[in-house]
């Protein structure tokens, strides 16, 4: 990387805003933080005195917990607000909620919201750094970064790999962020799924679209399955889950077409027997739990980079 490079983003809205250098810098930073999670005492004073608010106005388990763990391991004061406990349930707008939080002078707000672009709207009204933890069907940058970290851990480099994503592409913010990220890093991205799950014109993003799952996984280095986002669909877009599993579920027979060293990924939650057979989810090549582990490291890196942590010297413990 250029020795003059400097990470200059105050906010993390999406992978689209990032350069290749930004992505590499985040992944390298996350790699240095990953070692902390292997220690007997999993804590460093990097963000001591900093305040992080996790504002999750849409249901989440993995992402919310991952950001909370990340903040605590960096010694930040972390506070969690969910949709059910926020004043938005009483009619308060997102901006008013954020302004009230801002009055308490947090250093960073991690936001999950059902509306695309919510993080950008928030950033126009408050001074704290905003990290997008998922906004509608727009982006989920930290998930894409942990996915890229997991792939890089397994192959050393992302460039030249074939990444096959199967499932509900149209309603998945993970898919969009992964497409942008892996493409920027030099991978070939293939998409497969029912026609109702593939956005029209998505080929313009530089991806290859397949109607045949078997062809999509041919020689693939990475096979990523996505769940059906029923909460974002007004009407059912497939005949049944059983038929979906038969036609698009990832099983051992299908993976015989992939590269010998193929890895299996899923952003979670996994619907076993639908998008992934249990023997695949738990079998050789599955790196689903590695994704979870890397998620903490990536989110530590993001919090450090936007909240102004100090990592100079041995005393910082990194």
UniProtKB/Swiss-Prot annotation:
E.C. number: 2.1.3.2
Binding site for L-aspartate: 90, 173, 227
A single GO molecular function term of this UniProt record: amino acid binding
Biological role: Catalyzes the condensation of carbamoyl phosphate and aspartate to form carbamoyl aspartate and inorganic phosphate, the committed step in the de novo pyrimidine nucleotide biosynthesis pathway.
GO biological process: 'de novo' pyrimidine nucleobase biosynthetic process; 'de novo' UMP biosynthetic process; amino acid metabolic process
Subunit structure: Heterododecamer (2C3:3R2) of six catalytic PyrB chains organized as two trimers (C3), and six regulatory PyrI chains organized as three dimers (R2).
Superkingdom to which the source organism belongs: Bacteria
Family: Belongs to the aspartate/ornithine carbamoyltransferase superfamily. ATCase family.
Record keywords: Pyrimidine biosynthesis, Transferase
Pathway(s) it belongs to: Pyrimidine metabolism; UMP biosynthesis via de novo pathway; (S)-dihydroorotate from bicarbonate: step 2/3
Swiss-Prot/TrEMBL catalytic activity: carbamoyl phosphate + L-aspartate = N-carbamoyl-L-aspartate + phosphate + H(+)
Binding residue positions for carbamoyl phosphate: 62-63, 112, 140, 143, 268-269
PANTHER family: ASPARTATE CARBAMOYLTRANSFERASE, ORNITHINE CARBAMOYLTRANSFERASE, MITOCHONDRIAL
Species of the source: Desulfotalea psychrophila (strain LSv54 / DSM 12343)
Protein name in the entry: Aspartate carbamoyltransferase catalytic subunit
GO cellular component, one term: cytosol
